[in-house]
Amino acid sequence: MILCEESYPEILDQICSYLTPGEVELLFINKDEMRELNRSERGIDKTTDVLSFPLELVIHAPLGSIVINKDMVKEKAAELNHSEDAETALLFTHGLLHILGYDHEKDDGQMREKECEVIAKFNLPKSLIVRSEDVRLIDLINKKG
């Protein structure tokens, strides 16, 4: 179940139920608020698309919070030619997987695999991990060329 004061795409409820029976808090903020949150929580002074904050296991508490940058949702959806709902679903999935303990920077592809599973099940566009890999590959090709 999702705890959110704003409206959000219905598909997020389906994704959440598919991945966990637990509750998750969802927040939408703008790029400036996200930059400040990223700076204060991670020491990185730039905006980002999604942050997730797992909570310690507390009875009757949400599993954690997912914070989505609504400005970047609009930008990425337009840039990648898909809907804002689809972009929001990708970011939500990515954040929820982090809350559930997945870590694409440390695992052996388990998070990428789970993200791909959700993408296929809910017919979503390319995942954040795959998009990041595409950018790194293009950068590598450009450096060699």
From Swiss-Prot:
InterPro entries: MetalPrtase_cat_dom_sf_prd (IPR023091), YbeY (IPR002036), YbeY_CS (IPR020549). It comes from the Bacteria. Keywords: Cytoplasm, Endonuclease, Hydrolase, Metal-binding, Nuclease, Ribosome biogenesis, rRNA processing, Zinc. Zn(2+) binds at H94, H98, H104. GO terms for biological process: rRNA processing. Belongs to the endoribonuclease YbeY family. Its main location: cytoplasm. NCBIfam families: rRNA maturation RNase YbeY (TIGR00043). Single strand-specific metallo-endoribonuclease involved in late-stage 70S ribosome quality control and in maturation of the 3' terminus of the 16S rRNA. It comes from Campylobacter concisus (strain 13826). Binds 1 zinc ion. Its cofactor is Zn(2+). It is an enzyme of class 3 (hydrolase). The lineage of its organism: Bacteria, Pseudomonadati, Campylobacterota, Epsilonproteobacteria, Campylobacterales. Its EC number is 3.1.-.-. Disulfide bonds: none annotated. This is Endoribonuclease YbeY.
